[in-house]
């Protein structure tokens, strides 16, 4: 599903960026994926996706 229509960014692209780079802030996420650069309507949904994905990332100290 498209999250950002202005830049054609999908939820899958956001999820992949979060899984690969583990951003902790929206600023960090925006450096990885072009969201919120035009109208800004996608920011809320992108943040929600980031929060959902961050909850699924297992910290390294729990893996060992």
Curated annotation (Swiss-Prot):
Swiss-Prot/TrEMBL keywords: 2Fe-2S, Electron transport, Iron, Iron-sulfur, Metal-binding, Transport
Residues that hold [2Fe-2S] cluster according to the record: 4, 6, 39, 42
A Pfam family of this chain: Fer2_BFD
Cofactor: [2Fe-2S] cluster
GO molecular function: 2 iron, 2 sulfur cluster binding; metal ion binding
Record text on cofactor binding: Binds 1 [2Fe-2S] cluster.
Subunit relationships: Monomer. Interacts with bacterioferritin (BFR); up to 12 Bfd proteins can bind to the BFR.
Function: Required for mobilization of iron from the bacterioferritin (BFR) complex.
Family affiliation: Belongs to the Bfd family.
Protein name listed in UniProt: Bacterioferritin-associated ferredoxin
Organism field: Serratia marcescens
